[in-house]
């Protein structure tokens, strides 16, 4: 997910970046403490996109590779793909988000999760919360 850097000269953002999650530079988060792993978009991505009006999710059983466009997020501002931070097989999708995309804006790290993926054995290259904070600040 490519976000503009319009806020380069503004004050640091007051973003929620939970420590227990891992992040991609494309503004996805991954919770690998559970199986299957949970994937969503960060608060930063949700804020940049604005109010979501449509989310196109893959079907359970779909194969994803790190770097694939796996979800399409549409807002009144833009249509952006979510780039998969991991490789694996989609086990579950959040149908609540498909029915009401605004759930992602309201709770991107909780009820607004997007996918649950059974991960391959490959170790994904992800960022810690502190490393991700440097990307968005």
From Swiss-Prot:
Cofactor(s) needed for function: (R)-lipoate
Name of the protein this chain belongs to: Glycine cleavage system H protein
GO-annotated biological processes: glycine decarboxylation via glycine cleavage system
Entry's Gene Ontology cellular component terms: cytosol; glycine cleavage complex
Domain of life: Bacteria
Record key words, sorted: Lipoyl
Xref: SUPFAM superfamilies: Single hybrid motif
Cofactor note: Binds 1 lipoyl cofactor covalently.
Cross-referenced PROSITE patterns: BIOTINYL_LIPOYL, LIPOYL
CDD domains: GCS_H
Protein family: Belongs to the GcvH family.
InterPro entries per the UniProt record, alphabetical: 2-oxoA_DH_lipoyl-BS, Biotin_lipoyl, GCV_H, GCV_H/Fam206, GCV_H_sub, Single_hybrid_motif
Domain Lipoyl-binding: 36-118
Organism: Bifidobacterium longum (strain NCC 2705)
N6-lipoyllysine: residues bearing it: 77
């Amino acid at each position: 997910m490519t976000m503009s850097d319009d806020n380069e000269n503004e004050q640091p953002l007051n973003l929620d970046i939970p420590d227990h999650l891992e992040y991609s530079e494309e503004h996805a988060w991954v919770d690998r403490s559970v199986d299957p792993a949970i994937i969503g978009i960060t608060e930063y991505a949700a804020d940049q996109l604005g109010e979501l009006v449509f989310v196109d999710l893959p079907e359970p059983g779909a194969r994803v590779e790190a770097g694939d466009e796996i979800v399409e997020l549409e807002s009144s501002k833009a249509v952006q793909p979510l780039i998969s931070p991991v490789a694996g097989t989609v086990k579950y999708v959040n149908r609540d988000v498909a029915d009401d995309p605004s759930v992602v804006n309201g709770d991107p790290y909780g009820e607004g999760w997007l996918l649950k993926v059974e991960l391959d054995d490959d170790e994904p290259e992800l960022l810690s919360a502190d490393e991700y904070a440097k990307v968005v600040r």
